[in-house]
Amino acid sequence: VIKHKKAQWPWHGLTALVLVGLAFSLYMATSMISYEWRWNRVPQYFAYKAEEAQRAASYGTVQDIVISGDNARVTLKDESGAEQVLDVDKDSLQLARGDDVSEGDQIGVTRHWAAGPLAWGLWTTLWISVVSGALGLLIGLFAGLCRLSSNPTLRDLSTVYVELVRGTPLLVQIFIFYFFIGTVLNLSREFAGVAALALFTGAYVAEIVRAGVQSIAKGQNEAARSLGLNAGQSMRHVILPQAFKRVLPPLAGQFISLVKDTSLVSVIAITELTKSGREAITTSFSTFEIWFCVAGLYLLINLPLSHLASRLERRLAQSD
């Protein structure tokens, strides 16, 4: 085993050289078009120091100013004698003791860290992926079992659903769901986007479930029935646990695709990760830097998901 691992090191080194070569080629390509890299503009789109103006509530006078480090505590007294105390950053203070102030005058600002557009876009992508993925799994499990049902109506309806959804583009489905169904039922764009993604994912999960159940030998079901289990108990306790091990890889692949498909909901004005990236480019003019960051954030979501699915698959295989 040790010899085998040592023999693989040159190949891993070659892989690293290829990746370095690709990165260098990309750098040279950008140099040829005179692109100027501005990575220093990117961090503010993840987190930045937000300013919140502190204003006088009424007419009055600056009664006292107490400086403490980088902060200043300003005490205002109005005509009735009531006091208003404001904490502001010292360098933003615009008044001195004894100055008169009017209602709405800015005394200074307070600064605090706030999430930038890319951070909010990442959060939106995550919650849309989780919610639509969970709903899609439930829809797909139900539709997949309906496709195997002995009831012709359930089988026909589930077949129509699966073929209709799989046969049309997701982008078209989002438009139909938002502009037609959403208008009739007065749905929010977030609800429409999640519903469209869930129905789309459910159709593919249904086919994965159907194929997984059908891959289990019929003898398994017959053996379960011979032990006194009914059809539902046989499916729940015997067939589905075995099928789950087989459908785990395609299910993981489907959910990874779902994370990337969330970028399409930007067409109905949902500011997820891709739309946040486009908006950041319009103000930073750092096209390549922003898109590389967006791609990296998608990888940050999908690589752990893929790794988790692989580990779960190996653990289930060891339990056999």
Task: Report the location of each language-model feature.
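Transmembrane alpha-helices and adjacent helix-loop boundaries
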Residues: V1-K90, Q94-R97, S102-D320
